[in-house]
Amino acid sequence: MRILLTNDDGIHAPGLQALEKIARALSDDVWICAPEYEQSGASRALTLADPIRVRKLDSRRFAVEGTPTDCVMMAVQHLIEGGRPDLVLSGVNRGQNIAEDVTLSGTVAGAIEGMAMGIPSIALSQSMNYFHDEIVAHWETAEAFAPGIIQRLLEVGWPADVVMNVNFPALPPESVKAVEVTRQGFRDGHMRHMDKRTDLRGRDYYWMGFTAKASQPAEGTDLRAVYEGRISVTPLHIDLTHNETVHTLKGVLGGAPPRKVGA
């Protein structure tokens, strides 16, 4: 089995090293194509206004000056020799990718691009506990459980237009409670904010900030599973259509387009 690895934390990220260990537990045919620089929050961005440059680190390891989506496209179309990959693994991300964050995630986007190119794809993320003074990433947890989960998923299979999103709780392996197949959750509070600061020349600038606060996630969601110490496996569908609203709107907007009132 030929496996392509990518991420959004960059070619030197410890999570990519963890992912390589995971992949090599499954196959000896592993290729790595990751961003030269961190691309967290890049989502499915493409590099359109600049040339994409590639640095070859060894025969099967490449750093790309671009996004995770660029990396997967570049690897499949130009860099991998002898055939397309059978599996794309994206991660292991430093921090969870659950709930509404999946639409921002470059890690999930790398898996989506693999799916778009007809390759079974899985995103993997390692949660961290931001409520503690010392934030620790338990890469050993992802390394311990990911190979078995991936193998089981490959045995069962999944639809061609679905990607698997796997999140490991912020716990050492011996404290993980179970694996749970979940749906995508939604937080009950907005966590992002813009932090305004002033430089030494009196000019304002801003940093994107995140508020670490507890949520009350619904049963069966990725949020609930990870918060309670379980591994979350969520099948994600690229079709974002809300079918209930489609049904409602058809009764209101079907037929001739409405004109402005009073026109």
From Swiss-Prot:
It is an enzyme of class 3 (hydrolase). Coiled coil: none annotated. One of its GO terms (cellular component) is cytoplasm. It comes from the Bacteria. SUPFAM superfamilies: SurE-like. It is found in: Cytoplasm. It catalyses: a ribonucleoside 5'-phosphate + H2O = a ribonucleoside + phosphate. A divalent metal cation binds at residues 8-9, 40, 93. The keyword Disulfide bond does not apply. InterPro entries: SurE, SurE-like_Pase/nucleotidase, SurE-like_sf. Its cofactor is a divalent metal cation. Its main location: cytoplasm. Its EC number is 3.1.3.5. One of its GO terms (molecular function) is exopolyphosphatase activity. Binds 1 divalent metal cation per subunit. The keyword Metal-binding applies. It holds the Pfam family SurE. Keywords: Cytoplasm, Hydrolase, Metal-binding, Nucleotide-binding. Nucleotidase that shows phosphatase activity on nucleoside 5'-monophosphates. Belongs to the SurE nucleotidase family. This is 5'-nucleotidase SurE. It comes from Caulobacter vibrioides (strain NA1000 / CB15N) (Caulobacter crescentus). The lineage of its organism: Bacteria, Pseudomonadati, Pseudomonadota, Alphaproteobacteria, Caulobacterales.
